[in-house]
């Protein structure tokens, strides 16, 4: 896996998140795997180095509980460091300018109907993906959702540090990124608008305004 996302701080310094999508302890299988699950720093000359081991934090702390799994997915610069979403950890992390990790939020596991129409419910991970700082200074995080990837089952959460995640918008499918325009409208990017299980690769970009949602 390569970089999932990049961010620049006010000094123009770049960081990138490198995914993993596995138990962090599996990285001992080879030297090359040690570079996965990292927040890396890069210079203007193109040189890079591992900076913060996000996956190791999951191995050490497992903030959301459950089986060990780390997949650093998105990063956003903030005044005192960076905000990182980890899709495997089901958590949003703060990384200070000195590289110290702390938990901003964890996301709740839910249930979803599977097979569709059966009435049977199965556990579903939230799988937080894209994160952005909103115009109000809060953090906004989209969900891919885990299996069975139900159509309309993904949320966008609003997070203020020190408070539980607040549901901001719902009814999306397999979200991989979020963004705001200069007017404060939220854009939500779906990788598979009819569900990853549908076999249809069509995605969608959706603009959410005060008057509703509109596909772009």
Where are the language model's segments positioned?
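Beta-propeller fold detector
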Residues: 1, 48-56, 102-109, 113-114, ...
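Beta-rich, blade/repeat-based domains predominating
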Residues: 1-14, 18, 58-82, 111-139, ...
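A gly/proline- and charged-residue-enriched helix-loop-helix capping module
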Residues: 9-12, 17-64
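Short, conserved, GDST-rich strand-edge loop motifs in beta-rich repeat architectures
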Residues: 16-37, 140-153, 188-203
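A short loop-to-beta-strand structural motif that recurs across blades of beta-propeller domains
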Residues: 35-40, 91-94, 103, 154-157, ...
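Short loop/turn segments that connect beta-strands within beta-propeller blades
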Residues: 42-46, 95-100, 159-164, 208-212
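C-terminal closing repeat unit and adjoining cap/tail of repeat-based domains
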Residues: 194, 202-216
């Amino acid at each position: 896996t390569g970089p999932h996302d990049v961010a620049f701080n006010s000094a123009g310094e770049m960081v990138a998140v490198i995914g993993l999508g596995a138990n962090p302890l599996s990285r001992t299988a080879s030297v090359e795997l040690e570079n996965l699950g990292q927040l890396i720093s890069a210079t203007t000359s193109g040189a890079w180095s591992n900076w913060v081991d996000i996956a190791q934090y999951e191995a050490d702390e497992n903030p959301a509980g459950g089986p060990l799994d780390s997949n650093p997915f998105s990063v956003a610069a903030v005044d005192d460091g960076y905000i990182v979403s980890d899709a495997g950890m089901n958590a949003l992390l703060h990384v200070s300018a000195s590289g110290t990790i702390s938990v901003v939020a964890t996301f709740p596991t839910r249930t979803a109907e599977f097979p569709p129409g059966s009435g049977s419910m199965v556990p579903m991970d939230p799988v937080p993906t894209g994160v952005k700082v909103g115009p109000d200074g809060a953090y906004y995080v989209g969900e891919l959702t885990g299996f069975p990837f139900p159509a309309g089952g993904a949320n966008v959460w609003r997070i203020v540090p020190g408070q539980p995640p607040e549901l901001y918008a719902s009814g999306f499918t397999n979200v991989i990124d979020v963004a705001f325009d200069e007017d404060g409208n939220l854009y939500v990017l779906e990788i598979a608008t009819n569900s990853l299980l549908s076999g249809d690769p069509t995605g969608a970009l959706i603009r959410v305004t005060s008057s509703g949602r509109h596909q772009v």
